[in-house]
Amino acid sequence: MAKGQSLQDPFLNALRRERIPVSIYLVNGIKLQGQIESFDQFVILLKNTVNQMVYKHAISTVVPARPVNHHHASDRPATLEKTEE
């Protein structure tokens, strides 16, 4: 899995799991709003009054309505170990 994907998945999954409303801005300037129903490597399914399949390559920015905690234990920086001199 690429590093970019390992950042996207926990973030999008937290938004989906907690049903956090989002604003998604497309590269052409259009703003979409709703909740993330599901996603995969290429698309996000956005739910509002209708379901919309949005291709990730068309997305500029995803803005949650509130702060999101999407960090996992594996995301924490490693601590430096003391070396004996």
Curated annotation (Swiss-Prot):
GO MF annotation list: RNA binding
InterPro entries in the record: Hfq, LSM_dom_sf, Sm
Comp. bias intervals (Basic and acidic residues): 72-85
One GO process term, biological-process aspect: regulation of DNA-templated transcription
Highest taxon above the source species: Bacteria
UniProt entry tagged with the keyword RNA-binding: yes
Subunit and interaction comment: Homohexamer.
Protein name: RNA-binding protein Hfq
